[in-house]
Amino acid sequence: MGEDVRRIASQSRPRPSTWAVSRPRPASWRNSRGARPESWRVSRQSFREWIEHWEFEHENRDQILELGHELEHVPDLTVDVTPPATSDGPADSIEKSKEDGDADDKRQSASDSTVKGKAKAVDIGKQQTRDAPYSVHSVGRRRLIVLAASLAGFFSPLSASIYYPALPVIAHNFHVSNSQINLTVTTYLIIQGIAPMITAGFSDTAGRRPAYAICFIVYLAANLGLALQNDYAALMVLRCLQSAGSSGAIALANGVVSDIVTPQERGSFIAFASLGSILGPTLSPVIGGLITQYLDWHWIFWFLLIFTGTFCVPFFLFFPETCRKVVGDGSIVPPPINRSLTDYLRKRKRVKSGTEANQPATKRQKMVIPNPLSTLQVFAVKQTAMILIPSGIAFGTFYAVLTGASNTFKVIYGFNQLKVSLMYIPLGVGGIASALSTGKLVDRNFRRHAEKLGITVTRNKRQDLSDFPLERARLEVGLPLFYLGTACLVIYGWILEKQYSVWGPIILMLVMSWTLAAFFQVMNVLLVDTYPGRGATVTAAVNLVRCELGAAAAAVISPMTDGVGEGWAYTIVAMIGFATTPLLLFTAVNGIRWRREAAEKEKIKKAGREAKIEAEKRAREEIETKKEAKQKAEEDVEIGDLEKQDRKDSQRPTSSKAT
């Protein structure tokens, strides 16, 4: 490791005119070489403070910062830090550089660092990232975190479909047409696609917990208003507010997965993260039908209010902050606004035991105004767009079946509203089956490709996957499932057309739910792989495409079945989905090259941002220098005036005596 650190230091550019540090020399620095030491023996935490607050100017500064973070988790480790030759200590050398202004000293390169100890040496870069734990949470704890995030995303699709059975009753109570009451469904889906664009970018910078808090506060308030209102205009406005609050949590589930799970095991976790959004549309009509059958339709929203409140209490007490920009791998104590009860207990326990609490994040994140344009930028990336289009079409296919089932089973098989609601159970069973099976298939295929390439897959460790065929590994699982789902859709349509036994559609609905839901999950895994660290943002883009295409499919399926019949209507929908699959094949072939090109572009952008920051810093330093020079000149003038006045005052008594 020492050789790698020295190599990085040797690549550094000249030291700036002043070394910036935000605190004096830590007390844990110990002089081990006499009055003029060549190095100091420091603790792990002091080493991190040193590399964090001395502003190294070289391209590998982020790697050194990351090294300091990882050293905190290596036991029995000490660090020898070699300071500048003229230094009496880190803080002393800083002050000396400011006072002397020695040109040679200002150009001196950043100090070398060597690391020694009982810990196994690792390389900076690929080796270092491979050996570093990706998350401090155990496997069981990570599963609970993802399950909680999935349940939080369950409320949006639940609220979208739960009052479908009550639409005729609500229209009769408000004395409006069916078209007007259906407008509340359309507006809900539109807001459901837009709201995550705002919350996703906010959560990627400020943290997941503040974003969840805002979403659920809005959602609870909207449910309370909907349970109490009896006006069509209020229903329309509050449904939009309900959609904005609940749908914001959809994108956060995959963001949580990207925070704590590596690509090697991401398939299983994202399958569970998608479970809530899959079960919502399938189970909610059953719940809504039962409530409408035996209670007043207002109780739909009372049920949502009580259910959500019961969920939120343990969720906000124990759900930890996972955003890597705030807590890193989970070992850093987050700011107060991001802390759960367990964070407070952990910090209190560490203080009582005499252990210093974990350091705050390397750079405390500022609360930023949510920018929906950051989500729209996802569509500008070609590989992402080629994945989003087939994924959205597949979701539209699923919604076409979901929406058309209500009227189809009522007209063809003569079912009442309660029986129609029970027909959605096979869709829910298929969704559960996909969550239990898809992740294992995805992870197994990942390991198969890794074995072919001679790569050892390690759990909860970062690995360099720049040359790994991620697209091929994911799509080899997803595409066959999608083909099977579209084939079942064609058969489903013609069975309804010929009015065969109801058991045929029931079985096909279960298979379609399993295959299409599994395809959604595979696409989610691939998209999160494409945008590491921005899982919430890319999921918001996915949600936008799916909701809008789902709304379109829900709107056109009824006219299509009335015009050409169920057989040709669902055949056309299946053919549209099948026609988009060449985009995925093209992505599988060119995915590695596209990721490399994207990484190079990001590197250039990062260099440009750093150059801009450096230019702004130098400009501020010049302004401060001019300001200090001007202030000094004014002080000199003022001192000169005072000296003249003193001389005049001293001459006045002499003149009086002479007189």
Curated annotation (Swiss-Prot):
GO terms for molecular function: transmembrane transporter activity. Residues 93-109, 605-634, 641-651 have a biased composition (Basic and acidic residues). GO terms for cellular component: plasma membrane. It comes from the Eukaryota. Its main location: membrane. The keyword RNA-binding does not apply. Phomoidrides A and B (also known as CP-225,917 and CP-263,114) are potent inhibitors of Ras farnesyltransferase and squalene synthase. CP-225,917 and CP-263,114 inhibit Ras farnesyl transferase from rat brain with IC(50) values of 6 uM and 20 uoM, respectively. CP-225,917 inhibits squalene synthase with an IC(50) value of 43 uM and CP-263,114 with an IC(50) of 160 uM. This is MFS-type transporter phiD. It comes from Fungal sp. (strain ATCC 74256). The lineage of its organism: Eukaryota, Fungi. The gene is phiD.
